[in-house]
């Protein structure tokens, strides 16, 4: 019997469909929760990390789960050649953990960030999106554990449902993973044509990427949901064959060298700055704090929402209109505050490169609320780290190396103090 661990975190929600898909092809799925003893993972022949919203996508999708001790053991098992499939949120976890694409020492090489639906050069939609998507197999069948029963060039139609499914990759790394045939599935239209715009590309992924595997071919991060349709069964039957053949991995490698994280000091300009603090408990900050404590850091984490507002004229009147709109903060549970100076505390401003959320708020304020005096809005998050014990600077550097606060491929970061 081929036993596959179905790995679930708090917030996972597609385990039933995954169990059904495994049963259809002869795999024996076994529930494995995040709080089970990690050493028991070695008893399994393969692993599937299911979709959903692990830890409510706090900080960003997949990153809290990626720091869980389970992933350390999954890395060990994957190095033995065992297959690991991450679906949707599972794909985000594999990317945030560095298991995909497989850089040296599990360095982060990819990002899965907010959807951006583009047609004729214009952004026509952002955020969560669900549909049925066409996927084309663009690698040789034996290049990946999950494609052995699929012909190169074949396409199939399966469901897709996510808010952060847009693959981002450095150009040089993308060239390498293409050459290695790690770009397993790409979005195509009904005729099998790969067109880099919506609706063929449903989320703006670079190179129309829907799934990417690691260098050995035994770990795959896939955003659409093959478990939700029989159309995806060949992925699971391929996994079974791969295990039965003794895990025949590939010997590819990646030479891409991840650049060092460059964090500049934040220089405040003349624009209006709103720093929003929560009245109630900030569960997102608590989750990040707990994850760091689990990693051995004696820290306190707090968080503020940061808005930078560029106003053309009538500044005080315009700010009053923005305030009354309720678009930038909810006065029932938030208030405008400031970054507090505290001992052994560092603050970092994190922003998405594309700042999709800031642009959406700008459009809403101008179009819905007819506040035309705003020329630009930038959205960010301020993370405050208080180090209770240990060396202050080395603790900060170690925390930044976890990427828990931001993925450097899709975010920019500034040191406030």
Regions found by a protein language model. Name each.
Residues 1-101, 120-125, 129, 200, ...:
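N-terminal beta1-alpha1 cap of cysteine-dependent amidohydrolase-like domains
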Residues 20-24, 174-176, 227, 237-238, ...:
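Short, solvent-exposed amphipathic alpha-helical segments in soluble enzyme
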Residues 101-112:
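A short alpha->loop->secondary-structure connector
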């Amino acid at each position: 019997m081929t036993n596959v661990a179905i790995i679930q975190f708090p917030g996972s929600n597609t385990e039933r469909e995954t169990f059904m898909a495994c049963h259809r092809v002869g795999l024996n799925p076994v529930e494995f929760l995040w709080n089970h003893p990690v050493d028991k993972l070695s008893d399994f022949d393969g692993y599937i990390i299911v979709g959903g919203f692990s830890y409510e996508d706090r900080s960003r999708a997949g990153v809290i789960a990626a720091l869980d001790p389970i992933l350390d053991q999954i890395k060990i098992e994957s190095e033995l050649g065992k297959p690991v499939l991450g679906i949707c949120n599972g794909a985000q976890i594999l990317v945030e953990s560095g298991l995909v694409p497989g850089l040296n020492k599990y360095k982060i090489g990819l990002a899965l960030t907010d959807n951006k639906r583009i047609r004729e050069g214009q952004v026509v939609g952002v955020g969560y999106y669900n549909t049925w998507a066409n996927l084309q197999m663009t690698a040789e069948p034996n290049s990946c554990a999950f494609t052995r029963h699929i012909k190169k060039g074949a396409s199939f139609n399966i469901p897709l449902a996510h808010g952060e499914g847009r693959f981002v990759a450095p150009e040089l790394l993308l060239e390498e993973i293409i050459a290695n045939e790690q770009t397993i599935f790409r979005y195509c239209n009904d005729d099998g044509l790969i067109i880099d715009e919506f609706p063929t590309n449903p989320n703006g992924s670079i190179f129309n990427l829907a799934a990417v595997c690691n260098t050995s071919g035994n770990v795959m991060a896939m955003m659409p949901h093959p478990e939700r349709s029989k159309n995806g069964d060949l992925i699971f039957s391929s996994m079974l064959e791969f295990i039965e053949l003794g895990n025949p991995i590939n010997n590819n490698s990646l030479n891409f060298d991840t650049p060092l994280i460059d964090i500049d000091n934040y220089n405040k300009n003349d624009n209006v700055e709103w720093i929003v603090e929560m009245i109630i408990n900030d569960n997102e900050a608590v989750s990040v704090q707990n994850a760091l404590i689990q990693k051995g850091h004696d820290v306190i984490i707090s968080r503020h929402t940061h808005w930078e507002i560029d106003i053309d004229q009538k500044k005080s009147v315009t700010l009053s209109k923005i305030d009354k709109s309720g678009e930038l903060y909810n006065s029932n549970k938030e208030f405008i505050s400031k970054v507090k100076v505290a001992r052994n505390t560092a603050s970092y401003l994190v922003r998405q490169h594309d700042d999709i959320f800031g642009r959406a708020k700008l459009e809403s304020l101008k179009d819905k609320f007819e506040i035309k005096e705003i020329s630009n809005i930038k959205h960010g998050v301020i993370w405050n780290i208080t180090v209770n014990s240990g060396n202050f600077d080395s603790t900060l550097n170690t925390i930044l190396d976890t990427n828990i606060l931001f993925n450097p491929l899709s975010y920019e970061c500034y040191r406030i103090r």
